[in-house]
Amino acid sequence: MHVDADAFFASVEQRDQPALRGIPVAAGDVVIACASYEAREWGVRAGMTIGQAVAACPRLRVVPLRPAAYDAASAALFAVFRRFAARIEPGSMEEAFLDTRTTPWATIDQLAAAVQRAVRQEVGLPVTVGAGRTKLMAKLASRSVKPHGLRVIHPAEERYLRPALLVDELWGVGEVTRERLRQHSIRTVADIGVVHPEHLRDIAGTQMARRLAAIAAGTDDATVRPERPRRSFSVQRAVPRGTPVDVDGLVAELAGRLRGAGLTGSVVSLSVLYAGNLEHHGRTRLGEPTDDPAVLAAAVGPLVDAATARRIERVGVTVTGLQPAGAAVQLTLDTGY
């Protein structure tokens, strides 16, 4: 089963501020991080500058990001998931695959409805639920009925649905691979099934060829991999032309995620994508582990300054060296990265 909160940041804002319900809302600082479905109807999308978004939708209400609120909502969401599933595989802070094979319930359709209802009643957020025999089918089911939909792809439906799937619809298959497949007139899962394995490896590479062959055979991944201890927290943002990197917004979201997890971090890394797909990376170690946005901003700022020789299209900040908040660690020169 795949469960995905709808327009997560915007939905949290609408939940917490009744005056925002039913109107176009977006959460963001310099750029839009998330738009409600009411705003999306006007063409507002994540990555737009606030000016672009307001030009597209003059009635748009833009609210600042509240990372701590989103982390609290995420924790409540996953608490509901754990009641219904033996194992959970997070996809992000607002979505996850649930292994419900051992959950006692009359039918999968009723179980999916129960999960959706529990999240709405206990967390106050709308979610879309999709279920299927494999993770691909569950993801396709949820994607097809957003927002706040519910769909179960039963094996009988899967038998005729799977061969007709377009390669563009396959979750986990990147655009580069899709384009290579199209260049060889491979447009559907049925097309994949008749390609010689060696030819498929030449087109897509060994690992992806195995995945594609499994999709064609109906033996693709159905294993829900349980949560693992966090090793990092990352935030990525598009940087619209003519706007500076929103360092404060990036670190505020990171700090909120760290605090929500009860963790601090000691290493900050910056990744930058320039026009033309050129990349730049920077890294610095903090004096001590922290979840303080001011300390994180002081570390990220110089890394960004060192990367602004060209126009930046996308920027990401990652915090590693995680440990529980309050743990005392004396860093030494030979600690290393």
Residue ranges and their predicted role:
Residues H2, E169, E179-R314, Q323-A328, ...:
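DNA-contacting surface of Y-family translesion DNA polymerases
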Residues M1-R211, V319-Y337:
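Gly/Gly-Pro- and Ser/Thr-rich, intrinsically disordered tail segments characteristic of DNA damage-repair
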